[in-house]
């Protein structure tokens, strides 16, 4: 594997210099393959180290991996290369997710600059989240097309994301701010929706859960550190510097993936191999299975696959619908806290903007503690069970992880709401956020694993629908959060009754994983989509 050669930078250098990355050994292998196919007209046989490509009924020579140890297969890359790609995805996810919360410390200044109320400015947060809810329905499926791959989607969409921060920082009206924020969320979405697929490209199933956890920490770290970084910019300069800083962070991520992010999509790598074979031999029959399958898709079929099916699954499947609502609530609480924390810690404890940003670190600490415990659970329980079953296990088994987590969310909300008063030390409500982080982390890990195992054939559609559902819910919460807390009070505990309302809703959700654990198999057996 030529690591740098397979990056966007390497491909550009190759294109400009007109150098072919084919070598004499590969050419020799291709010609030997062709001679064997022509002489034997056989398929799936081997001679020495050379695999004869299968010839289908239409005369296409199907290009696959040479064998299980093919070095171009991302699963066979060296450890250092996999770790570099994992870092790329985690940092890219952080760089986009930080864009949601980095916005919040400057809301008051933006109100003064634009002469508008709170809700119109908060729409900048709402539309950003809504943008990365809709984006995956359009951009993520493009990464599954063999001719496109994942790498170029990451680079091009992030380039647009970086450029959009310039008019956002320079604008002085909602007419500029709101469309730019929506577009930024839209073009930042591939990292959030496709990052997990990239990790699945390079890590074996028994190692993937560990590295998915690191990716989750990157996703949590963005919103958690955003208020601190944005607050520092507001204090040091102005609200405009929130977006200049976001441009710098995402610009650095763009440089990293431009130089150090190779293509990981199996379909695209094999497509490029088939393309090289066609170029070397002049034989246009060299094709990949994915290439042939995608060539038969019409625009209507593609729309059904990417837009309609995720919505149908989200509404018609009881398992998917119930988990989407639950995950949506948990996800929305995080964005609601972007309004609740300033109300509590600024009005009651008189924190500065910087100090208020530090409050969110409690969530990150809770996530890191849970991560360490979850790793032990994976190593001692989950992975051995997976290996012992040969990968054939009931999906409901993973829901056990969520059982304690279902109680953590309401505990956190009641604790946070009623401890947030001047007579109670400020550290007490912050400690409650550790329970939220732990509950959210475990719930997301178990429920996403359950959805993936229950709908293996339609996992992309299920995850796209979940992303749309939870992000749409989260986008709406900041719009009514301040009014809810201000109107419910009481004045000595301003977030108490608002948190209590959410805590009661969270209590109503507690039975969901238990019900699915007991009756999930029956529900799946009645579904035409589930395994």
Swiss-Prot record:
The keyword Transmembrane helix applies. GO terms for cellular component: Golgi apparatus; plasma membrane. GO terms for molecular function: fluconazole transmembrane transporter activity; spermine transmembrane transporter activity. InterPro entries: MFS, MFS_dom, MFS_trans_sf. SUPFAM superfamilies: MFS general substrate transporter (SSF103473). It holds the Pfam family MFS_1. It is found in: Membrane. PROSITE patterns: MFS. The chain crosses the membrane at residues 83-103, 119-139, 158-178, 182-202, 214-234, 241-261, 325-345, 358-378, 398-418, 424-444, 495-515. GO terms for biological process: spermine transmembrane transport; xenobiotic detoxification by transmembrane export across the plasma membrane. Its main location: membrane. It is a multi-pass membrane protein. Keywords: Membrane, Transmembrane, Transmembrane helix, Transport. Belongs to the major facilitator superfamily. CAR1 family. This is Caffeine resistance protein 5. It comes from Schizosaccharomyces pombe (strain 972 / ATCC 24843).
